[in-house]
Structure formats: C-alpha cells, structure tokens
C-alpha cells in the first residue's frame, strides 16, 4: 500500500526543505528567492558544507498552507541550475 504526502500532512504545517547544491555564494539567495515567491516570510536558512567543500546543503522551513504549495516548491527549487537534489 502506497501512502502519499497529501495523506500524511495536515495543513497549515511547518515543512522543511533540504536543498543540496554546488558550493556557490548565490545558492542561499536563489533558494530564499524561490521560497519567497510561494511562502513569503522572514527566513534564516541553515547552511552546511559537505566534507570536501564542493556542495552545500541549505535547510529552510516554511509554514505550508496546502499540498500544491509544497509540490510547487519541490519542483521550482529543483529547477535552480546549481541545485543537485531537494529533499
């Protein structure tokens, strides 16, 4: 039996994205810019470098109001050129 995200969440809810991308200075700004378009707010993303320093992970938590918002952000964050993965 498959369970999808919509069945697991009750909205509004706090939802954290972890975005992995190339270790470039603009990564955080690009992530926040995309999030601001769909969930305006004051964000302080947490940034962690990879062990070799080639990649950064950016964790950012939003107050999600509906499943479409969550899904749209997954898609748009993944479309950032220097992003390699979104969890």
Swiss-Prot record:
One of its GO terms (cellular component) is cytosol. It comes from the Bacteria. It holds the Pfam family DUF493. Belongs to the UPF0250 family. HAMAP family: UPF0250 (MF_00659). NCBIfam families: PRK04998.1. This is UPF0250 protein ETA_23570.
């Amino acid at each position: 039996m498959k369970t999808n995200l919509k069945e697991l969440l009750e909205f509004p809810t706090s939802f954290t994205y972890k975005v992995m991308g190339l270790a470039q200075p603009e990564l955080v700004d690009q992530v926040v810019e995309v999030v601001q378009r769909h969930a305006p707010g004051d964000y302080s993303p947490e940034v962690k470098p990879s062990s070799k320093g080639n990649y950064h992970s950016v964790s950012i938590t939003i107050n999600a109001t509906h499943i479409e918002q969550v899904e749209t952000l997954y898609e748009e964050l993944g479309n950032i050129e220097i992003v390699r993965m979104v969890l």
